[in-house]
Design a protein with these regions (language model features):
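Membrane-helix interface/capping residues of multi-pass secondary transporters
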Residues: 42, 51-54, 91, 120, ...
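Transmembrane helical elements of multi-pass membrane transporters/channels
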Residues: 22-41, 143, 177, 206-210, ...
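Small-residue hotspots at the loop-to-helix junctions and early N-terminal turns
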Residues: 49-62, 137, 141, 200, ...
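Residue-level signal for short hydrophobic patches within transmembrane helices
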Residues: 13, 17-36, 40, 63-70, ...
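Small-residue-rich hydrophobic transmembrane alpha-helices
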Residues: 54-114, 151-170, 264, 277-341, ...
């Protein structure tokens, strides 16, 4: 059995370093492009609509992030399961897992879309959305939620493609959809003056485009990756396997979102200059982190395929190569941002007070962003081996609970911005040590048991 095509990567034989690099870089590019497109969305609505429209879109960001992180995590479960079956050369199971994943995407997408129409306003009120923007915020969210089935189809469909080693075609779909989204934003907001509605409609249409492209690709693949729409049905066995991996990963993403809301509240306590400065520096942290996350996803998929194929020594090499790439490339990019911080930060602001806070964040957090590679790659390798709950628990404790304890104790006593910022590298070190230790224990258990 073969799932190879000119876009896929043979993960179970040959040199690893070049294949991991070829797989990870398009993933990093996808994340970076998505961030850039989101920035364009914000710029268009802020510049050509109104401050209320900008606030309405912004007030939804944490809630939308919460939902997206949950389902991206669940889609990771399908990636791991299908990659394992590819390694095992189990054609029947690949077919069942793919059709289960796509049907789960459709059902859950429609469920969130419908339920969201009823709970949009209560949830936004619960989050403390200001009265002067609540109506616009509800309007934006309700329109945005109409695209949830398509968001889910893209996430699950691209995860299926990545399980074969194909990370380029999901990138191409994202580029096309992102360009369409940007153009529609300009037309609907500037020409037709639809404001918040225009931004939301543009997002829905772009999600329809990206998901349609991914589904088209899958329906025109060769067996056993080929998607047959008439054969869509849920296999309980495959669903359980997908959820065992996916739910812990999704809940981890949700915990991150909740913790970030609390951290943002502490940043807010330092005033508007701190909020603006932190936001400016955070953009560069995102770009550096996207490299780490891409190699973590590579570790998941490569490890899962090779573990399924019984290539245990390659699993060890995958961990080492992914970690080195993530550390080096993230370190180089972070170093460029830190050394050129005056130039990069002034792209966003020239306000002297804002720059004071921006410099503190970029010097402390961005400089040490490469530390995230230790726990991200270790967690990715464990998920590839089929362990998802353990890395989720370690990450939640190390990167969420510890940070919340820090801001509720240390920052209460020493209310200084840089003291808040050192919370990040401290939590990264603690989480990294715990995660790498757990990885070696899990690896020894897996390889000893299978032998």
């Amino acid at each position: 059995m073969s799932v190879s095509n000119k876009k896929s990567i043979d993960m179970t034989s040959g040199a690893l370093w070049n294949k991991i690099l070829l797989f990870a870089l398009p993933l990093a590019a996808s994340s970076i492009l998505q961030q850039l497109f989101n920035s364009v969305d914000t710029a268009v609505v802020g510049r050509f609509a109104s401050s209320q429209a900008l606030a309405a879109v912004g007030s939804n960001s944490s809630l939308i992030s919460l939902m997206i992180n949950l389902f991206i995590g669940i889609s990771l479960g399908s990636n791991v399961v299908i990659a394992r079956y590819i390694g095992e050369k189990s054609e029947k199971n690949i077919h069942a897992a793919i059709h289960t994943a796509i049907l789960v995407a459709i059902i859950s997408g429609f469920f969130v879309m419908i339920a969201g129409q009823f709970i949009a306003k209560p949830v936004l009120l619960l989050m403390g959305t200001p009265e002067d923007v609540i109506d616009l915020a509800v309007l934006y969210l309700r329109i945005y939620l109409l695209g949830m089935p398509f968001i889910m189809l893209y996430d699950f469909g691209s995860s299926i493609l990545r399980s074969t080693g194909d990370s380029r075609r999901p990138l191409y779909c994202l580029i096309v959809a992102g360009v369409i989204n940007t153009l529609l934003n300009l037309v609907l907001v500037i020409v037709f003056r639809l404001g918040v509605s225009g931004v939301a409609i543009a997002t829905v249409i772009s999600n329809i485009v990206s998901s349609s492209m991914v589904i088209y690709i899958l329906t025109h693949e060769s067996e056993p990756i080929k998607l047959e729409l008439r054969q869509l049905k849920i296999s309980v066995k495959e669903l359980k396997k997908i959820l065992v991996i996916g739910i812990p990963a999704g809940l981890q993403g949700m915990m991150f979102s909740i913790a970030n809301v609390c951290i943002q509240s502490t940043i807010n306590s330092f005033g508007s200059s701190a909020v603006a400065g932190s936001a400016a520096a955070l953009n560069y942290e995102f770009f550096a982190y996207f490299l780490v996350n891409a190699f973590a996803q590579a570790a998941v998929t490569f490890t899962s395929q090779n573990y399924g194929a019984g290539e245990y020594n390659r699993c060890k090499k995958i961990f080492r190569i992914s970690l080195v790439f993530a550390l080096v490339l993230c370190g180089i990019l972070s170093g460029i941002f830190v050394m050129g911080r005056e130039f990069f930060l002034r792209i966003y602001t020239t306000d002297a007070d804002v720059l004071v806070f921006a410099r503190q964040r970029i010097i402390i957090a961005t400089t040490l962003e490469l530390l995230t590679a230790v726990y991200e790659i270790s967690a990715g390798a464990m998920r590839g081996l089929g362990y998802s709950l353990l890395p989720a628990v370690i990450t939640c404790v190390g990167s969420c609970v510890i940070r919340l304890i820090w801001i509720s104790t240390v920052c209460k006593v020493v209310h200084v911005f840089w003291v808040l910022m050192i919370m990040y590298p401290i939590s990264w070190v603690i989480t990294g040590i715990a995660m790498m230790t757990a990885y070696y224990i899990v690896r020894r258990k897996c390889f000893t048991f299978t032998h």
